[in-house]
């Protein structure tokens, strides 16, 4: 059998988190229905059928309401909700954790079971 080598003259597609939308198409060989859809994308909006116009309107309305909801959430977080309680401060959490360790709370399988009381450090 003959091994086919990759064409390195063309850009290659790789799924990576740091580059989510590469310049390469996900599908290299389009089917007949996909080619027809590509040609339809180039046409005018007025050439759409009534069902397609209704579908476009529904999707547009859904996106509008999702965006409006996002704006409401941002405004609520900024102007409605107050600041976080002092118990969320890092210093408070550190004091609370130290107190839990001093009281040896849940020594079997909890936080105190992972603390070495002789060395005063977390077990490894």
Swiss-Prot record:
Belongs to the cytochrome c oxidase IV family. It is a single-pass membrane protein. InterPro entries: Cyt_c_oxidase_su4_fam (IPR004203), Cyt_c_oxidase_su4_sf (IPR036639). Component of the cytochrome c oxidase, the last enzyme in the mitochondrial electron transport chain which drives oxidative phosphorylation. The respiratory chain contains 3 multisubunit complexes succinate dehydrogenase (complex II, CII), ubiquinol-cytochrome c oxidoreductase (cytochrome b-c1 complex, complex III, CIII) and cytochrome c oxidase (complex IV, CIV), that cooperate to transfer electrons derived from NADH and succinate to molecular oxygen, creating an electrochemical gradient over the inner membrane that drives transmembrane transport and the ATP synthase. Component of the cytochrome c oxidase (complex IV, CIV), a multisubunit enzyme composed of 14 subunits. The complex is composed of a catalytic core of 3 subunits MT-CO1, MT-CO2 and MT-CO3, encoded in the mitochondrial DNA, and 11 supernumerary subunits COX4I, COX5A, COX5B, COX6A, COX6B, COX6C, COX7A, COX7B, COX7C, COX8 and NDUFA4, which are encoded in the nuclear genome. The keyword Mitochondrion applies. It is found in: Mitochondrion inner membrane. The modification N6-acetyllysine is found at residues 4, 35, 42. The modification N6-succinyllysine is found at residues 4, 35. It comes from the Eukaryota. This is Cytochrome c oxidase subunit 4 isoform 1, mitochondrial.
């Amino acid at each position: 059998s003959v091994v086919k080598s990759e064409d390195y003259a063309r850009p290659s597609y790789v799924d990576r988190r740091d580059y989510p939308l590469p310049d390469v198409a996900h599908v290299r060989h389009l089917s007949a229905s996909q080619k027809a859809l590509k040609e339809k994308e180039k046409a005018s909006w007025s050439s759409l059928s009534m069902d397609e116009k209704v579908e476009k309107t529904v999707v547009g309305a859904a996106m509008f309401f999702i965006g409006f909801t996002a704006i409401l959430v941002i405004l609520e977080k900024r102007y409605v909700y107050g600041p976080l309680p002092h118990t969320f401060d890092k210093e408070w959490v550190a004091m609370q954790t130290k107190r839990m360790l001093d009281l040896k709370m849940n020594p079997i399988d909890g936080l105190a079971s992972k603390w070495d009381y002789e060395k005063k450090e977390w077990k490894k």
